[in-house]
């Protein structure tokens, strides 16, 4: 690696550290002594970030892009959770030995900073404000997961798709006054997988929502009216 490349990577890590410090509401100076233990990585669309959350030793802050986290239970059920920047994950790995089985995939080109899990736990024990922030983030994540799981209990297909779209607007959508924008990674197939219904049925429901002027396509992005 040339000197210029090393300088660029060092600057990249410094900038990522600033974003991490801002995200968890602490002075960047608290994190700087641990910089050598962290890394910044770029993931291409479709690349696996980790195959199983019980194997990863790091907590990640997603700086750019979109990811999908797939949770598998003992019955073989799959729950798919989507995230956009900024999100810290997987938080349910903290302070416990047994963790849910989760795989993470980059839905778009992504950039993230990895922080050792034991470092995050150490900082929580020594800085109350970090613990409070992470507890708040974990509670928010749990509420989002409950909302998604409740959507899956809907017996009517259209109601299920509609509720999942509302969930997606909150978790990966960008607020534009009268509508939410969901980036181009969203597809009929992905929505079908998340809803647990056929692609054909999902496509039919999406066409109905477009006819009702609830959902629009802007290039490859989805625009969802707040009237949904």
Curated annotation (Swiss-Prot):
Keyword Transcription regulation: yes
DNA-binding feature ranges: 188-207
Residues at which a nucleoside 3',5'-cyclic phosphate binds: 22-141
Pfam entry (one): cNMP_binding
Superkingdom classification of source: Bacteria
Annotated HTH crp-type domain residues: 155-228
Protein name as annotated: HTH-type transcriptional regulator ArcR
Organism of provenance: Staphylococcus epidermidis (strain ATCC 12228 / FDA PCI 1200)
